[in-house]
Regions:
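Long, charged, glycine-rich C-terminal linkers/tails
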Residues: 26-34
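Intrinsically disordered, low-complexity regulatory regions enriched in serine/threonine/proline
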Residues: 2-7, 35-187
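Amphipathic alpha-helical segments
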Residues: 3-27
């Protein structure tokens, strides 16, 4: 299948589900992105359509604006990259997504036939309507993020652990965590 056919099919299905929810799509560039932005946060995900046939799906990111604004006030990022339309600094990231059989993390899902395209798209939509929606509902509330951070600490894991963590970033994740704790009046 051609890359354009894959994009057309996936975007038409995603648009039907996400546009009524208020998502905006940015379908140009190497990382087509869907964004739901509000006064408090931006929820987004992106995809990559690779020349070798693979399609990747990022799972959900949430940028909690108050956290990122505080962090940005003393730890600036490159404003030319973070445009707050398509690109946001990410506060949290859903690392616990259940991937479809045949999906290779970091590489994607190889789509050569219509049935594979349908299966991949169904998986993305199912995630967005179920586990993804639950992720947004749970972690758009800062005390729930703090609770997960506390659980990770008890388990001896860093907040941005690659397999089960909740916060995005590297060293800046620690700053995000401290900001979240302070906003939740945690000592």
């Amino acid at each position: 299948m051609k890359k354009k056919e894959k994009k057309d099919y996936i975007f038409s299905r995603l648009d039907a589900v996400l546009k009524p929810e208020g998502y905006k799509s940015f379908k140009t560039g190497g990382d087509p992105t869907y964004v739901l932005n509000s006064d408090d946060m931006a929820v987004y995900f992106f995809m990559n359509f690779k020349d070798m046939g693979y399609v990747t799906f990022s799972s959900l990111y949430i940028s909690i604006h108050i956290v990122e604004n505080i962090l940005h006030s003393f730890c600036p990022y490159d404003d030319s990259v973070i445009d707050k339309k398509k690109y946001f600094p990410d506060t949290i990231y859903d690392r616990n997504i259940k991937v479809i059989e045949g999906y290779r993390r970091g590489i994607g899902y190889d789509i050569e036939e219509k049935s594979q395209l349908e299966e991949f798209t169904d998986w993305v939509i199912d995630y967005l309507e179920n586990d993804g929606k639950q992720f947004i509902e749970t972690y758009s509330y800062l005390p729930n993020v703090l609770k997960r951070m506390d659980e990770l600490t008890i388990e001896g894991k860093v907040w941005q652990n690659n397999e089960v963590g909740i916060l995005s970033g590297a060293l800046d994740a620690q700053l995000r965590g401290l900001i979240i704790a302070k906003l939740c009046n945690d000592n």
